[in-house]
């Protein structure tokens, strides 16, 4: 029996196009298992407005629309989520953090099954560091690892 084909969603989070991190991710994607599909989304092309946390008010989160919907569907539609995240000031780029902030809303969007649907998907990271001290990337890697753990996602690590 063969396993179902893997579906990789690559979320490009750099503030510049065609940077070193994206180049590394595209090179790595050439070696994905045969039959795997790839979807590449660039947050430059899918800007999100500032996230508003309304959890403790009377308002409720609504179904995503526009760019948020595109990202929501891609996030839930993949088997493997790859965050292509250049190291900015020892952590994630602002656009990557904003994308993850939206997950707080998606956890509460009816029917409220985002956590269950994310469980079992593998979260990966691709990053490039210019510093000789690899510890500079620890906050970035930690953010991804803890995010995966919170949603019961296997963490594939960071290339």
Question: Where on the chain are the PLM-derived regions?
Answer:
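Structural signal for short hydrophobic segments within the conserved structured cores
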Residues: 39, 157-159
